[in-house]
């Protein structure tokens, strides 16, 4: 998915 935040752990 698409990374969000500092380390791309959140996914949209």
Swiss-Prot record:
Q: Which cofactor does this sequence's record say it needs?
A: Ca(2+)
The catalytic activity of this protein is classed by the Enzyme Commission as 3.1.1.4
Q: What class of enzyme is it?
A: hydrolase
User: Which molecular-function annotation in GO is an example for this chain?
Assistant: phospholipase A2 activity
Noted pH dependence of activity = Optimum pH is 8.0. Stable between pH 6.0 and 9.0.
Name its GO BP terms in alphabetical order.
lipid catabolic process
Name the source's superkingdom. Eukaryota
The record's note on activity versus temperature states: Optimum temperature is 50 degrees Celsius. No activity at temperatures below 25 degrees Celsius or above 60 degrees Celsius.
The record's comment on cofactor binding reads: Binds 1 Ca(2+) ion per subunit.
Keyword check for Metal-binding, yes or no.
Answer: yes
Please give the catalytic activity noted in the UniProt record: a 1,2-diacyl-sn-glycero-3-phosphocholine + H2O = a 1-acyl-sn-glycero-3-phosphocholine + a fatty acid + H(+)
Name the keywords, alphabetized: Calcium, Hydrolase, Lipid degradation, Lipid metabolism, Metal-binding
The UniProt similarity line reads: Belongs to the phospholipase A2 family.
Task: Report what the protein is called.
Answer: Phospholipase A2
